């Protein structure tokens, strides 16, 4: 986990460098909905002191350890299971297809949120005495909007009273306020806008089918989801996840549901959420479900957050932990079926826990080796020169070519490093190419890119100060002919050319109408402030609770009896 300034985590949706630039993308002060706030904002604010790569690694490892520890606590204190079951659930939390596939997709904060859900569930059930650490973990989950939803659903299910539930949900809302306030502001601003501006608050309905849960070999869509898999991107599926692995996931799920009756009796809301987390993504992967999702994306602002339905199988993780412990505990009872003969309850429960652990491992049998793509990679030396050039005049926007936010260098598809390395305002066009189809996208940026590729120079009037071309990501140089006519015209000059990157400077861009005002930045900045307040409150409450515990234990120790 040792950090090096020239290396970064770079894979698909993930780019975490040593230092994250506090630009308009990472701080979420762009007009478009912020995609990775407060995740990138936290990295940008802390990376001068703690390297971003080190911080990301620490968060991921800590989430795995906490999730495993509290999963064992759930098995012990909420289901009465013995040590073998506790070890099985502790293994299951980091070793399941959801966590592994999301890490390989580059959604590391989504994966960490999923691993933290057993801890969130346990602390929510523990009541007010555990509230400090609970608030901290809610903020950790809320590094991504998806994680905030995970945390909100989990505390709603496991909080012991209505008052505790409302307080915990309020903390979730405050932790998620960086993107909630931005979404509300965007909806309010768009209410009086024209149709083109209004479209920016909705998601392309064509993306519904692209992001639907994916069927897996031999088990179909429902079977994939039962095993906590089914991610939409087949390239993010571990190579070892073949027929044996998918069938193992289905068998694991079927064995777990032997304890469903008991889970329904004791934790009915958890049982409902567990079933819904599997069933609803399967429904939205059918033709009627995709049609319903298309309608929701076209008519409900911000619903794009829910189109990747397979990620919500993470909500089943706390339920799976309880079911695993419950089934194991059922085999440890003295009134076991006579068919087991003279086998002791302890032996049977140990065997059952071993079966669960073995099936969890079998769902991704080559897990450690599958993480090889997540190793930090060396960044091009060109980025230092590009950063220094842009830093000399950070006002204005930096346009990225070829069009799109993602790059493919050395066979490694990943989000463009420019979005998190460069100061100022690197432009994220916001569109994705999924299965050859273009979905989403900021209308103004797409129009600007179309003009440039057609040979029309609207850069200066659009507030663009820099244009960065990544030639190794250009599939057909002929497609760049129109853009090169513009970039070689008077008023634009080459600033940096190194390692397949070329940076162009646009002279005298019109910046007045293209720099976000303080009013436009206010919702996200206020949200970030509220996020830090909740984090600080959680840290203070946790420190106070820990200090009280130590003091109480110190006073409770028996004092030695003085000799007569």
What residue ranges belong to the model's regions?
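Membrane-helix boundary/interfacial segments in multi-pass membrane proteins
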Residues: 25-26, 98-111, 239-243, 271-323, ...
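Membrane-interface coil-to-helix junctions
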Residues: 1-67, 91, 95-103, 108-112
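Membrane-embedded helix bundles of polyisoprenyl
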Residues: 64-78, 84-160, 165-180, 355-363, ...
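Periplasmic/ER-lumenal interhelical loops and adjacent helix-loop junctions
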Residues: 19, 23-25, 42, 177-258, ...
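Signature aromatic-anchored transmembrane alpha helix within multi-pass, membrane-resident enzymes
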Residues: 83, 173, 328-364, 527-535, ...
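Extracytoplasmic
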Residues: 192-199, 359-564
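Hydrophobic, aromatic-rich transmembrane alpha-helices
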Residues: 226-233, 243-278, 534-549
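Membrane-interface helix-loop junctions at the exits of transmembrane helices
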Residues: 2-7, 84-106, 177-191, 214-231, ...
């Amino acid at each position: 986990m040792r950090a090096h300034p020239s290396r970064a985590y770079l894979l698909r949706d993930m780019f975490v460098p040593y230092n994250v630039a506090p630009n308009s993308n990472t701080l979420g002060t762009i007009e478009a909905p912020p995609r990775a706030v407060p995740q990138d904002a936290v990295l940008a604010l802390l990376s001068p002191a703690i390297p971003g790569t080190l911080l990301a690694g620490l968060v991921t490892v800590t989430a795995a350890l906490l999730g495993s520890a509290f999963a064992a606590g759930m098995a012990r204190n909420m289901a009465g299971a013995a040590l073998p079951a506790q070890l099985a659930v502790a293994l299951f939390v980091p070793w399941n297809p959801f966590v592994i596939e999301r890490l390989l997709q580059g959604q590391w904060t989504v994966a960490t949120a999923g691993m933290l859900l057993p801890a969130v569930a346990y602390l929510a059930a523990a009541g007010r005495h555990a509230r400090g650490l609970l608030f901290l973990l809610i903020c950790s989950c809320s590094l991504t909007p998806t994680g905030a939803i995970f945390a909100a659903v989990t505390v709603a299910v496991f909080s012991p009273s209505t008052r505790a539930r409302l307080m915990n949900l309020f903390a979730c809302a405050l932790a998620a306020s960086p993107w909630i306030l931005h979404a509300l502001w965007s909806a309010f601003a768009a209410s009086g806008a024209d149709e083109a501006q209004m479209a920016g608050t909705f998601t392309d309905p064509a993306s519904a089918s692209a992001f639907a849960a994916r069927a897996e070999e031999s088990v179909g869509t429902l079977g994939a989801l039962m095993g906590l898999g089914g991610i939409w991107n087949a390239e993010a599926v571990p190579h070892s996840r073949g027929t044996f692995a998918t069938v193992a996931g289905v068998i694991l799920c079927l064995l777990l549901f032997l304890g469903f009756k008991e889970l329904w009796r004791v934790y009915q809301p958890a049982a409902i959420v567990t079933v819904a987390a599997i069933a609803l993504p399967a429904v939205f992967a059918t033709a009627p479900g995709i049609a319903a999702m298309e309608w929701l994306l076209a008519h409900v602002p911000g619903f794009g957050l829910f189109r990747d339905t397979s990620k919500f199988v993470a909500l089943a993780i706390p339920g799976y932990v309880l079911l695993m412990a419950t089934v194991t505990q059922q085999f440890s009872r003295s009134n076991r079926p006579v068919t087991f003969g003279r086998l002791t309850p302890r032996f049977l429960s140990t065997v059952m826990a071993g079966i669960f652990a073995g099936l969890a491992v079998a769902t991704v049998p080559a897990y450690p080796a599958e993480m090889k793509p997540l190793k930090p990679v060396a960044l091009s030396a060109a980025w230092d020169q590009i950063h220094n050039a842009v830093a000399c005049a950070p006002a204005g926007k930096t346009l990225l070519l070829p069009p799109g936010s993602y790059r493919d260098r050395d066979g490694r598809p990943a989000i463009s490093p420019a979005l998190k390395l460069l100061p100022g305002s690197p432009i994220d066009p916001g569109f994705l190419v999924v299965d050859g189809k273009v979905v989403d996208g900021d209308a103004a940026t797409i129009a600007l890119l179309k003009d440039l590729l057609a040979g029309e120079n609207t850069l200066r009037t659009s507030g663009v100060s820099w244009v960065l071309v990544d030639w190794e990501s250009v599939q057909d140089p002929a497609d760049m002919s129109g853009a090169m006519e513009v970039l070689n015209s008077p008023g634009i000059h080459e600033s940096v050319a190194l390692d397949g990157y070329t940076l162009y400077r646009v002279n005298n861009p019109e910046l007045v109408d293209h720099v976000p005002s303080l009013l436009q930045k206010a919702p996200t900045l206020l949200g970030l402030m509220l996020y830090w307040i909740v984090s600080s409150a959680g840290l203070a409450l946790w420190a106070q609770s820990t200090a009280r515990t130590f003091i109480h234990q110190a006073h409770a120790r028996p004092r030695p009896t003085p000799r007569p």
